[in-house]
């Protein structure tokens, strides 16, 4: 059953990517982050209330860090979607799992201190090979699909995957502390709305496009559902 939920979440995530691609023709990345967060706040507040889950938390610092890295990843991903082919932007963001594996390998080696009581951890050759293969695969994919003027957007997309890895690890840490999912996602929505609003001061706002603005609604709904 958990595998089915993961497949459904991936489908919702991909569907949101399509909506972001359509909306990016009318809104910049900061606006998309802002409206995604604003719609998510309303939905998640109602969800938490229906589940009788209090939104007050004992771990504001951890939620703030999760929101910081999550919003950085979200903004970078939305920017990449607007500038790159959708499949390329999605693949770069999905690199988060490879980044997590790289962080785990690097963290284990950095934490090890050579003493007689703590021998050097076993070399995880298969894990290292998997990480390297993942990065090589992305490089091979990007070489034929990126134009010269898309190199910066490609780097931003790669950054979205790296920061998403930090965000996912923080979500795991919060869940181990007993934080409900709806509370964690609610604070992320708040962080998205605040960060997007601040960024709009510097990036400016787009002219309201009329009916195409309806793409903002499924972005917020699918984000909350995923």
Residue map of PLM features:
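Glycine-/small-residue-enriched transmembrane alpha-helix faces in small-molecule transporters
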Residues: 1-31, 131-132, 136, 146-173, ...
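Helix-loop interface residues and adjacent transmembrane-helix termini in multi-pass membrane transporters
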Residues: 26, 80-83, 120, 147, ...
